[in-house]
Regions:
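Aromatic- and charge-enriched surface segment that lines or borders ligand/interaction sites
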Residues: 1-33, 46, 52, 142-145
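Surface-exposed binding/hinge segments that line
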Residues: 2, 8, 35-80
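Gly/Pro-rich hinge or "lid" segments in bacterial periplasmic/extracellular proteins
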Residues: 69-126, 130
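Extracytoplasmic
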Residues: 15, 38, 46-50, 96-98, ...
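A bilobed periplasmic-binding-protein/Venus flytrap-type ligand-binding module shared by bacterial periplasmic
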Residues: 56, 115-119, 182-186
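Short, well-ordered beta-strand elements
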Residues: 1-2, 20-23, 51-53, 99-102, ...
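Ligand-binding "clamshell"
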Residues: 37-39, 163-176
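Ligand-site clamp/hinge motif
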Residues: 4, 118-164, 180
């Protein structure tokens, strides 16, 4: 793997092959999908921007396993302190990631506020300055918030009457798919 040379964590420290190796080993030891990384025997780090994965057998799903949903690259300089990564204090305070948005505020049961990472390694991205994720537990309250324009998107279980009600709103575009969840955007 060849890493993007100007990619950094939110604290400004560079993302290195050591972080990749550490992240893979952490996932192999702790993640519910650790079997996705079972064929990875070792991760060599010949230089800061190169990680070489040595496999015990071919792994056709390696690219999927390396996706951000299964393998987020975490900073070794923070999580390499020997504490349990699942209970690490930096999971909830002074969170450091590497994505397009930085966590600014998390209020359990209320909201999550993310702000644009000005140092994101892809120029011109992200396109938004801020994302506010409101936690609205009640379906009716979610629908009312959509109708009033208080939220721009909602994902929830919606029955036919909810979908028909929202389709009547001039400010909403409703896209429903089969399955247990649907999302609405205004």
């Amino acid at each position: 793997l060849h890493l993007v040379k100007n990619a950094t964590f939110h604290d400004g420290k560079p993302i290195t092959s050591e972080d990749v190796a550490f992240s893979i080993e952490t996932v192999k030891a702790n993640h519910p999908f650790k079997t996705m990384f079972e064929p990875v025997q070792t991760v060599e780090t010949p230089d800061p921007h190169t990680a070489v994965l040595k496999l015990s057998k071919p792994h056709p799903a390696l690219e999927l396993a390396m996706s951000s949903q299964l393998l987020s690259i975490i900073p070794k300089h923070i999580y390499g302190d020997g504490q349990d990564p699942k209970k690490h204090p930096r999971n909830s305070e002074n969170v450091v990631g590497s994505g397009a948005f930085k966590l600014v505020e998390f209020k359990k049961g209320q909201h999550i506020i993310l702000e644009r990472n000005e140092n994101y390694f892809i120029e011109g991205k992200p396109c938004l300055d801020k994302i506010v994720i409101r936690i609205i537990k009640d379906n009716n309250a979610r629908i009312i918030a959509l109708e009033k324009g208080e939220v721009h998107m909602a994902a929830f279980e919606a029955g036919p009457s909810d979908i028909n009600r929202l389709k009547k709103s001039k400010n909403l575009t409703v896209s429903a798919t089969s399955g247990p969840k649907c999302g609405m955007m205004s």
